[in-house]
Structures are given as C-alpha cells and as structure tokens.
Amino acid sequence: SIRFVLYSQICRYMKNSDLTTYGEYLEKLSPKHGREKVFNDFLQIVVCCLSMGRKEELYFKTIKPYDKTELDLFSQAFAALVMQMDRQPLVDPFGDYFQEFLSNAQNGQFFTPFGVCELMNQLITAPKVNDQPKQGDRRVLDPACGSGRLLLSAAQKDRALTFVGIDISYTCCLMTIINLCLNSLNGEVLHMNALTDQCWHRWLIIVDSVTKIPTVYEVEAGIINQPPACADDLKPLPVTGIIQPVKNMIPANFVRYTPKC
C-alpha cells in the first residue's frame, strides 16, 4: 500500500538525512495547500503511521489531495522529525513552529516556554515535609497540554510515569500523541473540554514491554481501534468511564473500559 511505500521512503531519508527541519519540507507544500492544512495533515499522517495499520481509512482520506511528489515531501518531513527528536529527546519539536505560523492569539494559544515547564516540574515534584509516596497511581496530568511540553519535562525526571494530556484543540492532541509516542512514553491523550467534560477523542500510547515499540490506539466507548471520522465530523461524547491499560492480556484485548459507578 502507499503507507508502506511511505515507510520505506522514511527509512531511506533517515539514512541520508541532513539537518533540514520538518518545517522546511512542509513549507514547500504550503503555497498550494495552505500552511494550516499541510501541518494538520502531516500530524494526522504521522499518527496514522504510528497506529500500525489500524487507521488505513483515515490515512487514505488524509493523503487524497496530494500527488506522489507531495507525499514524498511528507516522507522527508517525517524522517526529519524523527531525526530531530533522536538528536534532542524529550524536547518538543512542534510548539515553536505552531506558535510562529499557526497559533491563534485570540484563543490564547501561547505555549509555555520549556524552561518554565522545567521550573514547574521541579516545584511540583520537590520533596515536602511528611510527604508519603503514593502507591499504585503514578500518573501526571496536564489538562491543557498544548503540544505536551509539560509532560515531556516530567518525563525528563521520571520516564516510568503514565502521561495524560487533555486539550480542546484536536491539533494539539495530535502533537502530544506524537511527542509521547516517538519518545516511547506510556500515556493517554484526550481531545476534550476539561471544564465541561465533553470528550470527542481518546488515544492510548502504549510501549510494548517486550519489543519496546510504542503504538497509538484510539479508544471510543470501550471499542478499540474503531475507524474515526475526520476532525470536522466529531461529535461530543459524554465522559462515562475511565480508560485503563490492562496487563498480561493478548494485544487485541489489553485495553479495558471501566464504567463509572
């Protein structure tokens, strides 16, 4: 399929990579298709690829407007992104590009500088008098995660945590998914309004305990890997349960949806 051709191209470009950033490749597509559409489609393509074949329908829908030459540029952008994250692990590659070219000041889309994220993480995790370590639940939550910078900062201190990000922006959710997945961090991302509890999309990022390969799984109302609609077609769903990974189960059934009492 075209997706596997894309994979082979990515591998080839990674072997022959230079210091060209992913944004430079996307800018070559922007005059024809628009910068916002190109960036959003790039994120969606990457998430589909990281879903390991479970999002073929959405993948082909996303690449439909582009010809072979343009898809080749997406391959180069993906390879450049992987190499950039390999050179600078646990550092957000999306926020600066998004804020410079695409953020909406009227919506308050200003991303927290990474230095401030590190300071917040140190303040939150600083030992306190009579502080007792929590057993079992080892999650860190950012209810307005943006591109996931605060979660990446927390991962620099402890990668073994489960990282949970919430954002009302679908684009921000995709950025966080990619940041968690390509840094091999277990976590969950929810496209939702954290104030009203309206939820549109849920994803799990799970790193296989044996192969150490991270994979993205979309979960909706207890159904794993259900083909999604495009972002514009999403309808709000009530938050009625908690999604939890289940250990020691076969891959097809390792996610449990627990209804609230």
Residue ranges with predicted function:
Residues 20-21, 62, 69, 112, ...:
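Residue-identity detector for threonine
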Residues 116-207:
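Conserved S-adenosyl-L-methionine
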Residues 9-158:
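Class I S-adenosyl-L-methionine
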Residues 183-186, 190-261:
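S-adenosylmethionine
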Residues 1-13, 244, 248, 258-259:
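N-terminal amphipathic/basic-hydrophobic helices that include classical n-h-c signal peptides
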